[in-house]
Amino acid sequence: MCSTNPGKWVTFDDDPAVQSSQKSKNFPLENQGVCRPNGLKLNLPGLREFPSGSSSTSSTPLSSPIVDFYFSPGPPSNSPLSTPTKDFPGFPGIPKAGTHVLYPIPESSSDSPLAISGGESSLLPTRPTCLSHALLPSDHSCTHPTPKVGLPDEVNPQQAESLGFQSDDLPQFQYFREDCAFSSPFWKDEGSDSHFTLDPPGSKKMFSSRNKEMPIDQKSLNKCSLNYICEKLEHLQSAENQDSLRSLSMHCLCAEENASSFVPHTLFRSQPKSGWSFMLRIPEKKNMMSSRQWGPIFLKVLPGGILQMYYEQGLEKPFKEIQLDPYCRLSEPKVENFSVAGKIHTVKIEHVSYTEKRKYHSKTEVVHEPDIEQMLKLGSTSYHDFLDFLTTVEEELMKLPAVSKPKKNYEEQEISLEIVDNFWGKVTKEGKFVESAVITQIYCLCFVNGNLECFLTLNDLELPKRDESYYEKDSEKKGIDILDYHFHKCVNVQEFEQSRIIKFVPLDACRFELMRFKTLYNGDNLPFSLKSVVVVQGAYVELQAFVNMASLAQRSSYAGSLRSCDNIRIHFPVPSQWIKALWTMNLQRQKSLKAKMNRRACLGSLQELESEPVIQVTVGSAKYESAYQAVVWKIDRLPDKNSSLDHPHCLSYKLELGSDQEIPSDWYPFATVQFSVPDTCASRTEVRSLGVESDVQPQKHVQQRACYNIQVEIEKKWIKIDGEDPDKIGDCITQ
C-alpha cells in the first residue's frame, strides 16, 4: 500500500493471513466511527524492542483501535502503531511489554539534521505517482482535487511563509490518509468542520462536542503522537515538493529568458549583477618551486573597470582589488580539466605592451611585437556565468577613459584595423529567420609619432548626404545604415554627428575598441543550414542533425567566391537526466562517449540498434562535454575538402533511457551553432578612407571577420506506443 522507504521509516504491509476483525462490544461511544485496521501489520526496522512475553507479530486479528481523546495523546492503544497485549494500563512513561516505541522527530531548525533543504529531500517518503505530472507547471499538472492542509501548531505563519509552505500544493498526505486502515481523530481539514473518513466512500461522521472543545495545542503536545508524526511527514514532503516546483519554475523561466534574449537588442548586452562565483588560480603567477591550484572566490566588476575579489559572497571588504586600464585584455577562452569528470572554462586577464624590433631575415623588416604579462587567471564551471563575465569586462574596457602616456617615436608607423561582425539569429525548424541582428566592433592598434589625429570613413549611407565627394559611383556597392553606435572616449563625437567622419586621437601602442554599431541583416543566405530532429518512442530517444552547404545559386553576389567556414561548433543541449547515459565507466576514470568521423554513418546506411548510446558523425568529431552540458559537434572547416559541395553531413546519437519519465517536457528546444568566416562582413561594412592628418602616411592594415551565433529550433516527433498516455508528451508532434 505504501511505497518502499529507507530503513528507518514506518511501513505497513498487507497480511493475507489476517482476517477481518470482529467488532468489539466494549467500544466507547465516541470510537464507533473509527475505521478498521483491514489486517495490517507493522514493520519497524531498526527500532528497539523491550523484552516481553507476548509478541507484536502475532497472527491474531487486531481489534478496532480504542481511542481516548483526553487521556491518550499518542497513537491509539489498539492501532497498528501499538500492538494490544493485556488490559494492564501500565505506568506513565514506561512502554508496555510487546509494544514498539515511536521516538519523536526533532524540531526542524537551522542546526537540526532534519532541517528542510533540497539536499535532504531524498530521505522523504513519496507517493508512487507520475513525476512528470507532479512536477510540471500548472498547464501540465494533474487535475485531481487537492485537499487543503493546515500548518502545524509549532510553526507560526511568518515561519511558514519563509519556508514556502502552501496548503494547496500537496495531495500526498491525503492519499496516505485515504489508504490507511485506521483513522486518527487528530486528522482535520482546515476551512471545514472536523471529520474523518468511514469505510463507505463519501460518508462522513462528525466529532463529538467534547473533542471540539479540546484545546488546540493538545493535539501536538506529545511528540510521540501519531498526529505529530503525520504533520512532520506532511510538511517535510511539502517543503520537498515546494523546492522542486520552485526549481522547475526557475529553470523554465531561465530557459524562456535565454531563448528570448539570445538576439541582443542593444549594443551592450551585459546586465547589472551582484557578482559571480568564480575560481582563482593560486598563486597568481607561475612559480617553478610550487604548484598551482584553484581557489573559490566571489568576483565583482564595478563601473570604471574595478575588479573586486572576495573570499565568499556577503563579505563587506574584498581581499583584493584590481583597476583595469586600456592596456588590459582578455585572452582566448579555454576549457581545461578541473576534476576527474569535470571541466572548467578559463580566461586570463593580461597586460599587453608593444615594443618595436628589427628583424633580419631575407630582408630587413621592422615589427611591433607584444609583451604579455599575466595578471589573473580565472575560471568558472558555469558556462552562462562565464560568458556574462567576459561580456561585462569587455564592455567596461571600452568605456575606460584614455590614458595619457608619453608618446614613443617609431621608426615604422602603422595603423591596423580589425572589423568583427557578430551576427545573432534565431531560425525556426522550417529554416526561416524570425529574429536577427548584427553588431559590428572595430578594433584599432596604432603606432603613430606625435599627437596626430586620425580619420576613418565607412560606407555609411549618411556620408554622401553630408559630402558629395564620397558618393559611390559603383552601383553594385551598397552602403550600410547605422542604427545605433557608441564610440571610445578618444573619438570626437560632435565631428561625426556633423560630417559622419570618425576623427580620433589614438592610444599609443594599445589595441582598443574604437567603435561599435548595430545594423540590420541584409537577408543573405547563410553559408550552410542546419536541420535537427529528435524522435521519442517510449524511453528511446534519437537525435539527428543534418548540415547542408548553400549552393552557388543561393549565395548572393556580394559573397562572391565560396569562402570556408572555420571552427564550427554545434551544441545540442542535454537534460540532466540523460547525462549518466552519455558516460562510460572504466577502472581508471569516467569518460564521455566520443565519436570521430564515421563514414558508415552516411545517409541511407543501415545500423543495428545497440543497447548502449551511440554517437555517429560523417565529418568532424562529437562528444558530450560537461562544460557545456551538451553534445558538441566540432568541425574544423566547411565545406569539407574530402566531400563535394552538395553532400550533406549528419550527426546521430541514440539513447535508451531507463524510463520515459526521464524525458522532460521543458527540454530546451534549440541547438546553438557557432562559426566564423574570415575576410568577410555580415553587415557589408567597408572602409572608404583611413589615415592621419599628415603628409607622411603610416602603413595601413584592415582585417575583417564575421562571427555567427545562431539558434536553430529542434523539431520534436513522438511515436506513440501501446498503452502510452499522449498527454504527457507536451508539445511533441505525433509522427
From Swiss-Prot:
Q: Which tissues express it? A: Ubiquitous.
Where along the sequence do coiled-coil regions lie? none
Output the Gene Ontology terms for molecular function: clathrin adaptor activity
Gene Ontology BP term (one):
synaptic vesicle endocytosis
Q: Name one GO cellular component term.
A: AP-2 adaptor complex
> Per the database record, which ranges form the MHD domain?
412-715
The answer, when asked if Oxidoreductase is one of the entry's keywords, is no
Q: Which residues form the SHD domain?
A: 275-408
Localization annotation: Cytoplasm; Membrane
List every stretch annotated Disordered: 1-35
Q: What is its main location?
A: cytoplasm
Q: Which UniProt keywords apply?
A: Cytoplasm, Endocytosis, Membrane
Instruction: Write down the CDD domains for this protein, in alphabetical order.
Output: AP_stonin-1_MHD
Please provide an example of a Pfam family that matches this protein in its UniProt record: Adap_comp_sub
InterPro entries cross-referenced by the UniProt entry: Adaptor_comp_med_subunit, AP2_Mu_C_sf, MHD, SHD_dom, Stonin
Q: Which family does it belong to?
A: Belongs to the Stoned B family.
Q: What does this protein do?
A: May be involved in the endocytic machinery.
**Misc note:** In contrast to other members of the family, it does not contain NPF (Asn-Pro-Phe) sites and thereby does not interact with EPS15, EPS15R and ITSN1.
- Listed name of the protein: Stonin-1
Q: Organism classification, top ranks?
A: Eukaryota, Metazoa, Chordata, Craniata, Vertebrata
